[in-house]
Swiss-Prot record:
Upper taxonomic lineage: Bacteria, Pseudomonadati, Myxococcota, Myxococcia, Myxococcales
Protein's organism: Anaeromyxobacter sp. (strain Fw109-5)
Protein name: DNA-directed RNA polymerase subunit alpha
Top EC class of this enzyme: transferase
Source organism, top-level taxon: Bacteria
MF annotations from Gene Ontology: DNA binding; DNA-directed RNA polymerase activity; protein dimerization activity
A Pfam family annotated for this UniProt entry: RNA_pol_L
Function text: DNA-dependent RNA polymerase catalyzes the transcription of DNA into RNA using the four ribonucleoside triphosphates as substrates.
Keyword hit for Transcription: yes
Name of encoding gene: rpoA
Catalytic activity: RNA(n) + a ribonucleoside 5'-triphosphate = RNA(n+1) + diphosphate
Amino acid sequence: MVDPIVTKNWRDLIKPRGLVVDQESLSNTYGKFVAEPLERGFGITLGNSLRRVLLSSLQGAAITSVKIEGVEHEFMTIPEVAEDVTDIILNLKEVLLQIHTNEVKTLRIEADGPREIKAGDIIADGQVEILNPGHHILTISEGGRVRMEMTARRGRGYVPADKNKVPGQPIGTIPIDALFSPIRKVNYQVTNARVGQQTDYDKLSLEVWTDGSVAPNDAVAYAAKIVKEQLSIFINFDEAEEPAEEVKPVEEQKLNENLFRSVDELELSVRSANCLQNANIKTIGDLVQKTEAEMLKTKNFGRKSLKEIKEILAEMGLSLGMKLENWPPKAAPQGAPKV
């Protein structure tokens, strides 16, 4: 059994209320995520760890070699084709793939001119998905003919061309350096967060750009899982034997006194105030239990009002989507208005 005194090493640390996703800017290639409050210093610790893992350790798919009929090496040209082989290889490196298997897949292009060949013209089986079918690969003139075979697979990080050489490949097979990572860029910023009257906590803002083969929110989840799995070996006790955390009744918990204030004190715009009144939201405690989705369903309540309320709540160390058990409590803090 883990000593209850020892568990205070991690149980006494403040934990984020949850991960907030910026729904306005969220897309299949970009996401902004905010976690607060964090203990001082944890913003940089977590932000830097997640950034490094996102950029280096997530799996993706890429073309790793190509064999073109009539071509022996990458410095040759193909009759009646506008691009030389070097340019074609550069274009192949930018083809975005999803491969739903761990097997090496064979892709083909078989075309006669005149025509433009795009990524969508690649012949593949049902386990391979081309994510940018409009991407240009080459242009064939009248009388031209192209037959090429490529290999593609899943991998991690950047792999140079010489590492993609496979013994026994046919003569004329050209290995390609592959960038498997689905992550294009990661930024993070650490600012101050407020908890009650204290402002010496961290707020972590994380921005993630992907190639579209993985959703930004999934990418962050995968990176966090990798970090968690790697750190688990350092825990030298059985977490199952850890004593259950004592849950105090709501009356005994120290509630943020702002929860008992009327929403009229928030000095909101007329539109936002009217929306809260129509939704029968009287106190800040009532308000913070609403999710963003629930608020947006309120009549005449839009994104501008949502942003206004989120900013005001953040200044109080509060946010939408909080869970307050048995609200309102039987006894309000001394000096707080009755609800």
